[in-house]
Design a protein with these regions (language model features):
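Accessory beta-strand-rich segments of carbohydrate-active enzymes
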Residues: 8-13, 18, 27-32, 59-175, ...
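Short, aromatic- and glycine-rich surface loops/edge beta-strands on solvent-exposed regions
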Residues: 128-131, 247-259
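Substrate-binding/catalytic cleft of secreted carbohydrate-active enzymes
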Residues: 334-579, 585-590
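Accessory carbohydrate-binding/adhesion or oligomerization-edge regions at the termini
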Residues: 1-54, 132, 136-141, 212-214, ...
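Surface beta-strand/loop "capping" patches
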Residues: 170-200, 283, 288, 582-590
Length: 591
């Protein structure tokens, strides 16, 4: 593992020229108190959690303990303005000091945050940074996904602390804090609004749109823009290139502020796409997902985003790109990002490659009664999948406390606001299999208030309340029978055929849904499932497929890739051929 991992710019949708990456070796200590440790335990490779092999530590942060980080740093080149310290994600709650001054903190293990550290900097240099972290894992109500202190089966080792890039940038005194970009496919426009750091909220802007390096639309601060703090630019018809998996066109966007002297103005770079999601009946009256007005078969994989050396954190940006490119080359167009939020570069690569993302809200809440929410409901799914998620059920689902429900609302808003700039995100998934579920109908309303451009899968698997756009089925054990519904039918989890590939076996007991004994058997069972079970259901209304899963994860050996991503387990040519057959059958069905 390199000593300066993940050096790439971490925020592609809001870029500046100033950038100083702080990934690398830091000092660390694990103690029983929040105070600065008397001594350091050793070095940790940031941004890898201490529980991971890649960190060089291999220790688990227990609830109630404190994880401390320390390093020196040099601010970005330049003078004046403000210096911002950015964290891609820290799990879960942290306090940050610079030169002994508390500069801020954050709670929430999956979302980026920035702190203005200018006033704490040492004029003579020699700046020092301390970060103190606590993580309750399964003892709290916060979002935690598949993390557990007792890993096994479908649950994985807990991790804590800094797990995404840490970086610095120098900005003007009045800088853009948030950029809201709203494309309108039907109107062929994009509306850009920015908020700035100084009082007053929205900024007066100029904006330029480029397509393939050619300027196609611009607004240099008109009176109309100055009045409402936003600019709307029209895309010429000859440069109207809708985004899709077959043609993932991205427009380049440059935005700047117009207030003050030139050195006080801010300029940022971004991008956007023109695409439109909808649900509509096909020629036979069966509800289908539509992208840019045309029915589309969403054919994808469940993606949990774990890596053997770094757990949540990939070994390199290149490894991420190679995996996504291979998935696309195998003929898939969809990834369901399951119980995790990725670093923003992951979504950027999906934007560029044309991979559609269904994004789960990361599950949290109190302890789940797994005997009910997972095992009993799975076995008796035909009877239980539409149980009302009313208050009497909240204790079984881990949402009995008001604090837990308030935490979920805060996390939902943070998730949508963080990721809605990415055109690859096509569907929000508020709940999965009842984990932490409550008032799914209210969650759908909250999502649509924040983003009305995407689909919503209200409750993936079960405890479906009849809302959202998707009738979302999980099926590992029963014969698959689909019939047309008022919502579009998705098979949002299925398959999961296990095979512990020789040389890539799991560290503990192998886990999956039925086990193959060889590559040939795995390939044959995959083909039979897809062509004999799934394909006939397309004409009955099945419109989205999410096979479990991208890769093996810890004990789970039901991935198409091995855990280390070194091999594709079934025959790749067979996978491509099956996906082509599914696409051809769907096209014939909706003609």
């Amino acid at each position: 593992m390199q000593h300066h991992p993940l050096p790439e710019y971490p925020r592609p949708a809001l870029r500046r020229d100033s950038y100083e990456n702080l990934n690398g070796l830091w000092q660390y200590a694990i103690t029983g108190s929040a105070g600065l440790p008397a001594k350091w335990d050793g070095d940790i490779l940031v941004p890898y959690s201490p529980e991971t092999k890649a960190s060089g530590v291999g220790r688990t942060l227990q609830p109630g303990a404190w994880l401390h980080y320390h390093r020196s740093f040099v601010p970005p080149a330049g003078t004046g303005g403000r210096v911002l310290l950015h964290f891609g994600a820290v799990d879960y709650a942290c306090a940050v000091q610079v030169n002994g001054h508390l500069v801020g903190g954050h709670r929430g293990g999956y979302w980026p945050f920035a702190l203005d550290i200018t006033d704490a900097l040492n004029p003579a240099g020699h700046d020092r940074l301390w970060v103190a972290v606590q993580d309750p894992t399964g003892t709290g109500v916060q979002a935690r996904g598949k993390q557990t202190l007792r890993p096994g089966g479908m649950f994985y080792p807990a991790q804590s602390g800094i797990w995404q890039t840490v970086w610095l940038e120098r900005v003007p005194e009045n800088y853009i804090t948030e950029l809201t970009v709203t494309p309108d496919y039907d109107a062929r426009t994009v509306t850009v609004k920015a908020h700035t750091s100084l009082p007053g909220g929205a900024a007066n802007l100029w904006a330029v749109v480029r397509a393939g390096g050619v300027t196609i639309a611009e607004d240099w601060g008109s009176d109309e823009a100055d009045r409402d703090g936003a600019v709307t630019l029209h895309i010429p018809e000859e440069h109207f290139f809708p985004w899709s998996p077959d043609s993932p066109f991205l427009y380049d966007l440059t935005v700047g502020t117009t207030q003050g002297e030139e050195e006080q103005r801010d300029t940022v770079h971004s991008y956007f796409a023109l695409r439109k999601w909808s649900c509509a009946p096909d020629v036979h009256g069966i509800m289908r997902f539509c992208l840019n007005g045309k029915p589309i078969l969403l054919n994808g994989l469940l993606d949990q985003g774990y890596w053997p050396e770094g757990l949540y954190t990939p070994p390199s940006d290149g490894a991420v790109v190679r995996e996504l490119q291979t998935i696309k080359e195998l003929g898939f167009n969809l990834l369901r990002k399951h119980a995790k939020i990725e670093p923003q570069r992951w979504y950027y690569h999906c934007d560029k490659l044309g991979l559609i993302v269904w994004q789960d809200m990361v599950n949290g809440g109190g302890p789940y009664k797994l005997w009910f929410v997972t095992y009993l409901t799975n076995v008796f799914q035909p009877l239980l999948r539409r149980l009302p998620d009313a208050r009497p059920l909240w204790g079984l689902l881990g949402r009995e406390t008001e604090a837990g429900r308030e935490e979920y609302a805060r996390e939902l808003e943070a998730t949508v606001k963080t990721l809605q700039c990415h055109p690859c995100v096509g569907c929000w998934v508020p709940f999965n299999e009842g984990w932490g579920q409550f008032d799914a109908a209210g969650a759908v309303e909250a999502v649509r208030r924040l983003d009305d451009t995407c689909l919503v899968d209200e409750a993936s698997g079960w405890y479906d309340q009849g809302g959202g756009d998707v009738d979302s089925l999980h099926n590992y054990f029963y014969p698959l029978r689909v019939r047309p519904r008022s919502r579009v039918v998705a098979l949002s989890e299925y398959g999961g055929i296990a095979w512990p590939m020789p040389g890539h076996e799991p560290p503990r007991r192998a886990y999956g849904y039925g086990t193959a004994k060889s590559r040939a058997e795995l390939t044959a069972r995959w083909k039979k499932l897809q062509l004999e079970t799934v394909l006939p259901q397309l004409k009955k209304g099945l419109s989205a497929l999410v096979y479990t899963q991208v890769s093996d994860v810890e004990d789970e050996v039901n991935g198409l890739f091995t855990y280390d991503r070194a091999a594709i387990k079934p025959d790749p040519a067979a996978v491509r051929a099956v996906n082509q057959a599914l696409e051809a059958a769907f096209e014939k069905t909706v003609e």
